[in-house]
Amino acid sequence: MKQRNQKHIALLSVVLVPALLLSACGSGASGQLSSSSTAPGSEPAVSVSQPEPEPQPAVTTLRFSATGDNLIHDGLYLQARSRAGGEGYDFTALYESVAPFYKDFDINWINQETLVTDELPPSSYPCFCTPGALGRAVYDVGWRVISMSNNHSYDKGAQGIAATLRFWDDMPDDVVTTGLYAGEADYGNIPIQEKEGVRIAYLAYTETTNGLPTPSDAAANVIYTSQEDVIQQQIELAAGR
């Protein structure tokens, strides 16, 4: 009985070894032994490489607001005078209801309809002039691009033009002004603002200055919408920048 059992054990050993070998070959079919997995007469598998996807251009989104006309008559600056207790001007209340709206924008542009300066006394219709406190209130709301080209640009003649230019030049460096040019030689000096890698050119024109001609001794002048050749040249110049 012992010998028969030994024969059975030996026979099982012979049977198991081929089974293990077959199992090992079978495992190669799953990818571990790919070089020997091609069936006779069949074409070898060809690996097709997929083309690299083209890189997509980065998209920059800027939120822009435009406001006009910021025209300050005597009723408004007298209220501001009263709020300041008779000393100076406080225009804060004028914008407090709309100020939160402008916080949602990256760039805020405004047409400043009246001259802004502390060098000249404030005045109302028909020739406007507004205290400097108004300009500082405009800045505090978030307006940074100031257009000065409109029908009231010449209300105070050459003196008013020079004074309002000095006021805005003294404001923080992030203020951009547009619309007044120091003669024809300055028409190519187009204000450019860069924001998050985007370059923006600002051009501003007016249809009229209420019948007032450009003062002969003015430090700067507007460009009228009728000057189409000049406008076209500025557009082309701005596009190239």
Regions found by a protein language model. Give the residues of each.
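Acidic, metal/ion-coordinating pockets
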Residues: 26-33, 40-241
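C-terminal motif of bacterial Sec signal peptides marking the signal peptidase cleavage site
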Residues: 21-24
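Short intrinsically disordered, low-complexity coil segments enriched in acidic
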Residues: 1-3, 31-32
